[in-house]
A protein has these predicted regions:
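Glycine-rich segments within core transmembrane alpha-helices of 12-TM secondary carriers
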Residues: 130-158, 170-176, 259-260, 357-371
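Pair of pore-lining "gating" transmembrane helices in MFS-fold secondary transporters
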Residues: 2-35, 208-232, 257, 327-331
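Short amphipathic helix-loop junctions that connect adjacent transmembrane helices
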Residues: 27-43, 231-254
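Structural signature of the two symmetry-related core transmembrane helices
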Residues: 74-89, 96, 285-303
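Intracellular loop-helix junctions on the cytosolic face of multi-pass helical membrane proteins
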Residues: 1-2, 6, 126-127, 153-248, ...
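Intracellular juxtamembrane helix-capping segments at the cytosolic ends
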Residues: 111-125, 334-348
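Helix-loop junctions at membrane interfaces in 12-TM secondary transporters
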Residues: 91-102, 303-322
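Central cavity-lining transmembrane alpha-helices of secondary-active solute carriers
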Residues: 49-66, 257-270
Length: 411
């Protein structure tokens, strides 16, 4: 039986609880802003984009605290409590408390993002062979949270109202804080340890610089398209999709669960396909795999272009079009979202790996912000044209990835 180092399972459980609250919120936030607080579609998508972007910028602020005497463990526990306070403010159902709550949640999420990679690397310093499996477990638990939280959150909202859903999210963050503090003495003991060996900086020079800059551009285009699963695709599901299945109507927030479920379903199939590539000549580099992910992300919107043309005039279209889109988005998430940061660290010089990783996350934040702005076009342009634009932008990213692939084969 595989034994993980002490403290790791508690760390994983706390991450799962934190992700439960976050994914519960993102599955409901757009509808909450639009239907409950009276925001227009453009305003709601803008707020959503700014909020998610802030969760990728806030780790830079949180690192200033956790890198000092305060420490990663204390900073993470405090981040959970700050986020819990933010969720509790949403219970008030007013615009001022909503803005304050989202600010606190973004700050808390920033502190939480620092824990898994930093602490897991130190926990597995004596067992480097289990490091990747440990991170895979955290990723799996996070996706399980993404699968169940929209269902639980929407059920609570339907039965007891919006405050009940946000109260559940707040409770999950309190539980996360309690869990990590139960093993705080173990986790603090490894904070000062150096992480395991890194593959960063394997390639240097102008070629790797061009590739790193290309990856930052790619992060913008990728996340611009991926964020629509939490924004305009919910609106498409609500207003343009026939959601009736055997007499049961699929609640709109369940779309987020469908996406997470497809990620979990596609993951082993994709892993098996990539494993076969390892025994074939001409194994694709990470850049080529990322290019495939960008291609899948772009093609994901092709079914919705067709569906929008078929549904022109107000008629509802089948759920299969949406499932096709989400399935391809899941492939893109597994190839780009998972490989992108590690590829950045491999290319960056050892002394600048953190800076380039920060540039990647900064580009990710910019992509989410732009996605929120683009969402404002939902009510202004034909949906077929809107989805066509979302298809073209990731395909441009695929072209950038192919250029990176050519550079990598020359290095």
């Amino acid at each position: 039986m595989r034994r993980y180092p002490p403290g790791f399972l508690s760390l994983s459980a706390s991450v799962a609880c934190e992700r439960f609250g976050f994914f519960l919120l993102t599955s409901l936030l757009l509808l909450y802003l639009n239907e409950r607080l009276g925001f227009t579609t453009a305003q709601a998508t803008d707020v959503l984009g700014c909020f998610i972007a802030a969760t990728y910028v806030s780790p830079l602020l949180a690192s200033a605290v956790t890198d000092g005497r305060f420490g990663i463990v204390r900073g993470t526990a405090l981040g959970y409590i700050v986020a819990a306070a933010g969720y509790s403010l949403l219970v008030a159902e007013s615009r001022p408390t909503m803005y304050a709550g989202l600010t606190l949640i973004a700050l808390g999420a920033g502190a939480a993002k620092l824990a898994p990679q930093s602490l897991a690397t130190r926990l597995f310093a004596a067992q480097p062979q289990l490091h990747d499996r440990g991170l895979t477990l955290i990723y799996l638990l996070a996706n399980v949270s993404a699968l169940v939280s929209p269902v639980i959150g929407e059920t609570a909202r339907a039965w007891f109202g919006w405050p009940a859903a946000f109260a559940l999210a707040s409770l999950s963050l309190v539980v996360a804080s309690i869990i990590i503090q139960t093993q705080s003495h173990v986790l603090r003991s490894v904070e000062g340890k150096a992480g395991g060996s890194s593959d960063s900086g394997q390639a240097h020079g102008s070629g790797s610089l061009v590739m790193l800059l290309g990856l930052c551009v790619l992060a913008i285009l990728f996340n611009l398209a991926q964020m629509q699963a939490s924004s305009t695709l919910l609106l498409w599901t609500r207003d343009n999709t026939n959601r009736h299945l055997l007499g049961w109507e699929l609640p709109v927030p369940y779309v987020a669960s469908l996406h997470a479920g497809l990620v979990l379903a596609v993951s082993p199939l994709l892993a098996r396909a990539l494993l076969r590539l390892k025994i074939m000549p001409g194994l694709p580099t990470a850049a080529a795999k990322i290019a495939l992910g960008m291609l899948a992300t772009g093609l994901a919107y092709a079914p919705l272009v067709v569906a929008a043309l078929l549904g022109h005039g107000g008629s509802l279209v089948g759920l299969g079009w949406l499932l096709g889109c989400l399935g391809l988005l899941s492939v893109g998430e597994l190839l780009v979202g998972a490989l992108g940061p590690s590829f950045v660290l491999r290319l960056a010089p050892p002394t600048r790996g953190g800076r380039w990783l920060g540039a990647w996350y900064g580009s990710t934040a910019l992509g989410y912000w732009v996605a929120g702005r683009i969402g404002g076009l939902w009510d202004r342009v034909p949906h077929s044209l809107f989805f066509l634009g979302l298809a073209v932008l990731p395909l441009m990213g695929a072209a950038v990835s192919l250029c990176c692939h050519r550079w990598s084969t020359r290095l």
